[in-house]
Amino acid sequence: MFKEFKEFAVKGNAVDLAVGVIIGAAFGKIVTSLVNDILMPPLGLLTGKMDFSNLFINLSGTPVDTVAKAKAAGIPTINYGLFFNNIIDFVLVAFSVFLVVKQINRLRRPETPPPPSTRQCPFCLSPIPLAASRCPQCTSAVEPTAT
C-alpha cells in the first residue's frame, strides 16, 4: 500500500497539480491585493464610495436598519446588496486576472511551427509528401524534396 501511495505521490500529474495549486494560491493573493489596494481606491472615488452591503429585503416585517442588526436579531433577510458587492468583486478580479495573464502571455516566446511534411504538386496543386517522386492525384513526375 505504501508503494502504491509513493507511486501516486511522485507521478508527474500529482506533483504538477500540487505545484499548480500552490502557485494558484500565491497568485490569488497577488490578484486580491491588485483589486483591493490598486483598483478599488480609484473606483471608490469615482462612485462616491458606494457600498451596497446594507441593501436588503426584510422578510419578517420587524424594522431593522442594517444587515448586521438583522442577523444579530435572527431576522430573515434577502441580502441582494451583498450579492451585488460580490458580483462587482468577481468582475474586478476576473478582469484583473485577464490583464495579468495577457501581459504574461506577451512575454512568452512564440512557438516555432513544425516543418512542413507536404508540398504542393506543381501540376495539379494537390498536397503531396516531400519525398514523393510522383503525384498520387495527377500521376505527374516530380522531383523529390530533401527532408
From Swiss-Prot:
GO molecular function, one term: mechanosensitive monoatomic ion channel activity
GO cellular component: plasma membrane
Top-rank taxon: Bacteria
Recorded topology in the membrane: Multi-pass membrane protein
SUPFAM superfamilies for this protein: Gated mechanosensitive channel (SSF81330)
Cell location: Cell inner membrane
Keyword terms, alphabetized: Cell inner membrane, Cell membrane, Ion channel, Ion transport, Membrane, Transmembrane, Transmembrane helix, Transport
Chain segments annotated as transmembrane: 15-35, 81-101
Listed Pfam families: MscL
Family annotation (InterPro entries): MS_channel, MSC/AndL, MscL_channel
Gene3D superfamilies: Large-conductance mechanosensitive channel, MscL, domain 1 (1.10.1200.120)
Quaternary structure (record): Homopentamer.
Protein family: Belongs to the MscL family.
PANTHER family assigned to the protein according to its UniProt record, in alphabetical order: LARGE-CONDUCTANCE MECHANOSENSITIVE CHANNEL, MECHANOSENSITIVE CHANNEL MSCL
Record's function text: Channel that opens in response to stretch forces in the membrane lipid bilayer. May participate in the regulation of osmotic pressure changes within the cell.
Annotated protein name in UniProt: Large-conductance mechanosensitive channel
Organism: Geotalea daltonii (strain DSM 22248 / JCM 15807 / FRC-32)
